[in-house]
């Protein structure tokens, strides 16, 4: 629907994991979307969360290798290279493993989702772009450092890699309402965030134990109520002016664009309009 009703915006999934979806299926889906959007598709690949995968009986084995092999397979398929591939994660693919139609582009940008240091380095090594999880935004500096390490290892210039930082975002002139919209998200995902990320704002995993206990009891209202002011800093929230200030701080770290994630605000549609009319226009005017 987005592809059919737009002409300039890039479209694509962020982020698909190669445990629940085979690379061949991912390739067929993304080249179809690329054709529907007249060459505007982008693809995000990430290892997914081990605990969430375990809920459906899957084990997150060798995530780094699996993502790396997935990217290689996808590039072969999209470029219509009929070459055999053999790896530890997906076994042996013969030359018969190719798309039975020619994609309109031989290359679709592949962005790698990451929060751990090794996966962040992989962005620098092989990614056309990166989708680092910045929960909180203060993690950006360390994320960029890791991406740069990977880029140097592959003899690449990190400035050529599009780093699209993923942030939680809640926009409202009423700061209390903006924070209230964040409570459920932080309560649900906060206990699963990497310690190296949350320590940037003085949190540790034990801080989320009471929330996790409440969720296990299906006591979601208590879980939301236990979200603290410090935990709110995992996200960007507040008025347009407050959000712009934090986005400017993020820009200084080397992030090239921002992937604005949920909840957007207490009134999501209104927030989208304000992001377009005020926040995006502000940054366009300062270029």
Question: What positions do the PLM features span?
Answer:
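Active-site-adjacent structural elements that line small-molecule/cofactor binding pockets in enzymes
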Residues: 1-287
